[in-house]
């Protein structure tokens, strides 16, 4: 049996077993490669050495214990300054060093001159020289000493103002003072004129041939005085008092002054509440047969519109004597209206604490205006139905000369409407007008002769 075994086959089995053992040991730990495995043609990508690859265990990048610092291939004397040049001794300076020294000394000599000029212009005191003989410290001295603070130069003198700026400020202050002084006389004169008038004189205004629209300022300041020119009014009356269907929109009476030939229209501030008397309203007259302008100029309004309020007046039905109602605002001339000829419209009315100044508008007729005695207001019949209270009423009559006349029919405040006699007794101008001959005219004629924009009434009603 033993003779039958081949020794070669036994040797092969032994070699195989040894190789298997070696492979098992290599998996457990690194093994040193035999010398025949090194190939000088191979190069490692990790360390850059020849003789092994990146997968080889001989690579020093994998076994740090055997890692060696790679040596340089050659010295780079051209790139590295291995032997720096030593500075030359000051005893034998070269020609270049002499030129540099002269250039440095020149600016140092010019520094005191510059500082002296700066002190003269800026007014700062000259700096005292340091004890070590140096005139100024270098900018990097405070960085060398860690504990030393940064030097700060302070002066006890205040900076001087530029003379040009001082002159400008003085001229501006003087200019403001002159403007205030020029404005103050106007205010004083207007205040004196308003204070000189009595409570009754303030309620009456002066009328001229053609008064220009007065400019009203907000606040308690007096109004500007505008003197009119004696010329024929173009486009009808220059001012017509516009009022709403409330008692706060009533205007005071404006009576012409006979002794003043050319008085100035001076709207004054609001007087005490005296508009609830029965002498309310002014009368205006317009002549028929005139052309209507394209657009009526509107005067500036003082306050913003406010909500309307109900009036305390109630008008008796028995007090109406002929005429037609329905015009938003109508005016009545005085008895001597036809004799005086064309004149001016009434002055802008004053307001009471419960009233608001109304917007004055020109009528859409180019007719001459007659002098008026008192302002008169009435409300829309539609507004009366909307408010629920009985509004003021105006009686319209056509005169013999073809002009219209209007009279206010209103009951006294807080009185019963069943007493028309008291109202007629307190308002004599209404009784005088009732005696004049009158003709009943349909409302359409009144609307054509007296057209007033409804927008003005809405704005006046919202003023409250």
From Swiss-Prot:
Residues 182-197 have a biased composition (Low complexity). It holds the Pfam family zf-CCHC_6. Belongs to the FAM90 family. Residues 1-43, 70-389, 415-437 are annotated as: Disordered. It comes from the Eukaryota. Residues 74-89, 97-114 have a biased composition (Basic and acidic residues). This is Protein FAM90A22. It comes from Homo sapiens (Human). Disulfide bonds: none annotated. InterPro entries: FAM90, Znf-CCHC_6.
């Amino acid at each position: 049996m033993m003779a039958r075994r081949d020794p070669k086959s036994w040797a092969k089995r032994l070699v195989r077993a040894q190789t298997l053992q070696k492979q098992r040991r290599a998996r457990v730990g690194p093994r040193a490669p035999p010398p025949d495995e090194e190939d000088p043609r191979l190069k490692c990508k990790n360390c850059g050495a020849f003789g092994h690859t990146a997968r080889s265990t001989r690579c020093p990048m994998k076994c740090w214990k055997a890692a060696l610092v790679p040596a340089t291939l050659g010295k780079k004397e051209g790139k590295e300054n291995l032997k720096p040049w030593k500075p030359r001794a000051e005893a034998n300076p070269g020609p270049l060093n002499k030129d540099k020294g002269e250039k440095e000394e020149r600016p140092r000599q010019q520094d005191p001159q510059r500082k002296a000029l700066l002190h003269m212009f800026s007014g700062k005191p000259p700096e005292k020289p340091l004890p070590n003989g140096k005139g100024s410290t270098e900018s990097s001295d405070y960085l060398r000493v860690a504990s030393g603070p940064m030097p700060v130069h302070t002066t006890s003198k205040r900076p001087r103002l530029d003379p040009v700026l001082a002159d400008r400020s003085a001229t501006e202050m003087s200019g403001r003072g002159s403007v205030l002084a020029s404005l103050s006389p106007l205010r004083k004169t207007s205040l004196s004129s308003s204070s000189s008038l009595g409570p009754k004189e303030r309620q009456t205004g002066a009328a001229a041939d053609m008064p220009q629209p007065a400019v009203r300022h907000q606040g308690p300041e007096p109004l500007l005085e505008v003197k009119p020119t004696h010329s024929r009014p173009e486009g009808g009356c220059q001012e017509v008092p516009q009022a709403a269907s409330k008692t706060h929109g009533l205007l005071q009476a404006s009576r012409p002054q006979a002794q003043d030939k050319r008085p100035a229209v001076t709207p004054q501030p609001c007087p005490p509440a005296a508009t609830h008397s029965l002498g309310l309203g002014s009368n205006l007259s317009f002549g028929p047969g005139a052309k209507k302008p394209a657009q009526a100029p509107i005067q500036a309004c003082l306050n913003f519109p406010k909500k309307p309020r109900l009036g305390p007046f109630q008008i008796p039905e028995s007090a109406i004597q002929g005429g037609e109602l329905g015009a938003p605002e109508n005016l009545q001339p005085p008895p001597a209206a036809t004799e005086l000829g064309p004149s001016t419209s009434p002055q802008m009315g004053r307001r009471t604490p419960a009233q608001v100044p109304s917007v004055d508008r020109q009528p859409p007729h180019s007719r001459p205006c007659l002098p008026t005695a008192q302002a008169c207001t009435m409300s829309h019949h539609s507004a009366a139905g909307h408010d629920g209270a009985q509004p003021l009423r105006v009686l319209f009559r056509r005169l013999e000369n073809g002009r219209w006349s209007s009279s206010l029919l209103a009951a006294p405040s807080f009185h019963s409407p069943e007493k028309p006699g008291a109202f007629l007794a307190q308002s004599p101008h209404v009784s005088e007008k009732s005696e004049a001959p009158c003709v009943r005219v349909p409302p359409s004629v009144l609307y054509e002769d007296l057209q007033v924009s409804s927008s003005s009434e809405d704005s006046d009603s919202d003023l409250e």
